[in-house]
C-alpha cells in the first residue's frame, strides 16, 4: 500500500497537464466552445484566429480546423443521418456538401507567441452533436465536436 501512493501521485502529475488540452472552458457550453474553435464565416489569418482559442486554454493548440460557414448551417448537419464517431458513439453526422475551411498548424512559439501555418481546404466534415444546454441556440441538436475532415 505504501508503494501505491507515490505511484498514484506520479500518475496524477503526469496526467494533469494533459487533461486540460481536451477540456473546454467550463463557463462555456460545449456548443459555444465548438463555435469559438471551429466556426469562422470569414477566413482570418491563422495566428490571429488561433490567439482567440489559445487565450482560453493558455497554451498553443497544435492543430485546429476552421469551417467557413455559419453556426446555423453547421448545426443543420446535426439533423442528417447519424453515423459512428471515432470514439464509437453514434452521435456523429456528415455534411452533405463540402465547405471551405482552413487548417491551422503550429509551426513555432510558446504561448502567447504561437505561430501557425495555414492550408485552405474544400472538404466534407463530420461533427458530433448533442442536445443543447440551457444557453445554447434552440436547435434539436447542436455541434459539440469536429470529429473528422474528409
Curated annotation (Swiss-Prot):
GO terms for cellular component: cytoplasmic vesicle; extracellular region; extracellular space; lysosome
Highest classification ranks of the organism: Eukaryota, Metazoa, Chordata, Craniata, Vertebrata
GO MF entries: endonuclease activity; nucleic acid binding; RNA nuclease activity
Feature type site, description Facilitates cleavage of polynucleotide substrates: 59
EC main group: hydrolase
Residues annotated as binding substrate: 61-65, 86, 105
Protein name: Ribonuclease K6
Marked site positions, Critical for catalytic activity: 61
PANTHER family, alphabetized: RIBONUCLEASE (PTHR11437), RIBONUCLEASE K6 (PTHR11437:SF4)
EC annotation from Swiss-Prot or TrEMBL: 3.1.27.-
GO BP of this protein: antibacterial humoral response; antimicrobial humoral immune response mediated by antimicrobial peptide; defense response; defense response to Gram-negative bacterium; defense response to Gram-positive bacterium; defense response to virus; innate immune response; RNA catabolic process
InterPro entries (UniProt xref): RNaseA (IPR001427), RNaseA-like_dom_sf (IPR036816), RNaseA_AS (IPR023411), RNaseA_domain (IPR023412)
Glycosites: 55, 100
Species: Homo sapiens
Disulfide bonds listed in the record: 46-104, 60-114, 78-129, 85-92
Effect of residue 36 to A: Strongly impairs bactericidal activity, bacterial agglutination activity and binding to bacterial lipopolysaccharide (LPS)
A Pfam family recorded for this sequence: RnaseA
Self-association and partners: Interacts (via N-terminus) with bacterial lipopolysaccharide (LPS).
